[in-house]
Amino acid sequence: AGFRKELQDNHPDVDLVNISYENEEQSIEDMLLEALEEYPDTAGIFCTNENVTESVLETVGRLEDKEIKIVGFDAGEVQIQAIRDGREYGTVCQNPYGMGYAAAVAALRAASGQTVDNWIDPGYQWVDRNNIDVEEKDGTIFNLGEKFGNKAGH
């Protein structure tokens, strides 16, 4: 709903032509190929999780004469490399450190009888070729500690 609202409110020149959901009946590849056949002028694809992004990257990589910008969600190894290679335009990264921290605070507050907010936003970050190798990512990319030498992954 948020994705559609953002397009509708702030990007009226962008047409949302297809929404596909991962299911057991049809592979991501098959859904994507059907959508691209129906909408051959597709300029971009937004993927809502790491597995879908990896499948889309693989499928689009096999297509000839297709210039499609792929935007992912999460930041697995395949996505990080795809951003560096220019195959993925960018990704919205979750903040695992912030998620863990917020969960610990919420658990402690609940255990001590305090109220816990109904909505907790642990943060996220846009990552693309311009900032993929910047060290100050505040724990957003998984395995950050190993990649950038940070302590405890933050």
Show the residue positions of the predicted features:
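Flexible loop/hinge segments that line or gate small-molecule binding clefts
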Residues: 76-89, 130, 136
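Hydrophobic alpha-helical segments within soluble ligand-binding/sensing domains
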Residues: 1-5, 27-29, 75-79, 94-112
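Hinge/cleft segment of the Venus flytrap/periplasmic-binding protein
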Residues: 6-10, 98-154
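Short, structurally constrained coil/turn elements
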Residues: 10-13, 38, 64, 120
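Extracytoplasmic substrate-binding proteins
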Residues: 1-13, 17
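Hydrophobic alpha-helical
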Residues: 3, 17, 21-82
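Short beta-strand elements at the ligand-binding edges of bilobed clamshell
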Residues: 19, 85-97
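Conserved beta-strand segments of alpha/beta enzyme cores
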Residues: 15-17, 69, 90, 125
